[in-house]
């Protein structure tokens, strides 16, 4: 496999090791700029990114030798897939890597809201012991609506079932029957799910059909005691509509790991007391990054060998 690989973002060292063991020449430049990529992309058969680097049509047009663009992660919205397809470039991702990490983060975010953990921590640091004000709720017996029942959605369903939550599911494709029986899934359309659930978690890609799928009208369907979690992609929820719902008390809480504009350090949602934010860290565990790197290395090798 005497071919060259450009790794543009910080990834687990195992990726470079595995590729080099298989005879590939690897250039690791985790801080490379778009301008630098434009200058050198024409020299590589494989380009690897994570979240930071955007592989645009302009870059792809310069990628004359490129056979593969690989993302060490799940979502592919930082790669122009249409441009890649036009040049017969394979686009790979590592959905397997993030399954457990993202599902566990959702559980953490639900517990953070249910027990007001971020607020409790802040108040103690500020010298306030507000035990009596922090009357939480339990997850046991609550209804969790899962929008999108792929690998991550199903993993979340199993974890939530172990906490004795009731699972409502919606997906545009057929839902796995075995999984449905395992967790006692109640299938519903989106509107029914939104109006019934105490917590709603999103696990869908960002497409034209999912952009702002949660807008002001959809939020009005939800109970005032309900809480929303998004670890999928920022554009799935209309953040202005979400801000108004939280501010006006029409929704009890929200937790977002992903935002329409990232970094989201100046986002006005972060001024609200009933909002929890994390910095797009769903797949940011040692285990997930190691697994994703191994998965991508294996896929790259298989494609170059003509096996995949």
Where are these regions (language model features)?
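An N-terminal-biased, well-structured beta-alpha scaffold segment characteristic
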Residues: 1-92, 195, 215-217, 221
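N-terminal Rossmann-fold cofactor-binding loop
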Residues: 9, 30-31, 171-173, 232
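Rossmann-like dinucleotide/phosphate-binding beta-alpha-beta segment
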Residues: 21, 132-224
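Short, Asp-centered acidic motifs that coordinate Mg2+ and/or phosphate
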Residues: 45-46, 68, 199, 227, ...
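Short glycine-/small-residue-rich Rossmann-like dinucleotide-binding loops
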Residues: 52, 74, 198, 204-206, ...
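Residue-level detector of alpha-helix initiation sites
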Residues: 54, 75-78, 97-98, 143, ...
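Rossmann-like dinucleotide-binding domain for NAD(H)/NADP(H)
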Residues: 87, 91-92, 177, 225-308
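Phosphate-binding beta-alpha-beta segment of Rossmann-like dinucleotide-binding domains, i.e.
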Residues: 87-89, 94-143, 158, 162, ...
């Amino acid at each position: 496999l005497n071919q060259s690989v450009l790794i543009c973002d910080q990834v687990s060292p195992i990726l470079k090791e595995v590729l080099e063991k298989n005879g590939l020449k690897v250039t690791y430049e985790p801080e490379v700029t778009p301008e630098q990529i434009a200058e050198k992309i024409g020299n590589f058969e494989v380009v690897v990114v994570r979240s930071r680097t955007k592989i645009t049509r302009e870059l792809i047009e310069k990628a004359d030798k490129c056979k593969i663009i690989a993302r060490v992660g799940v979502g592919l919205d930082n790669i122009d897939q249409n441009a890649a397809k036009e040049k017969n470039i394979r686009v790979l991702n590592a959905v397997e890597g993030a399954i457990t990490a993202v599902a566990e983060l959702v559980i953490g975010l639900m517990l953070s809201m249910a027990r007001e953990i971020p607020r409790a921590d802040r108040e103690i640091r500020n010298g306030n012991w507000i035990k009596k004000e922090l009357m939480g709720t339990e997850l046991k017996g609550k209804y969790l609506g899962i929008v999108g029942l792929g690998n991550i959605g199903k993993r979340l369903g199993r974890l939530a079932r172990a906490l004795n939550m009731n699972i409502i599911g919606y997906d545009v494709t057929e839902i796995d029957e075995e999984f449905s029986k395992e967790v006692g899934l109640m299938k519903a359309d989106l509107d029914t799910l939104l109006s019934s659930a105490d917590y709603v978690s999103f696990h869908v890609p960002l497409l034209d059909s999912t952009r702002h799928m949660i807008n002001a009208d959809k939020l009005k369907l939800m109970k005032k005691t309900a809480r929303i979690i998004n670890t999928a992609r920022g554009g799935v929820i209309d953040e202005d509509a979400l801000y108004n719902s939280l501010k006006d008390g029409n929704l009890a809480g929200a937790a977002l790991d992903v935002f329409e504009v990232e970094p989201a350090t100046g986002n006005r949602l972060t001024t609200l007391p009933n909002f929890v934010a994390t910095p797009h860290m769903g797949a940011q565990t040692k285990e997930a990054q190691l697994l994703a790197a191994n998965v991508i290395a294996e896929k790259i090798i298989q494609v170059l060998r003509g096996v995949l």
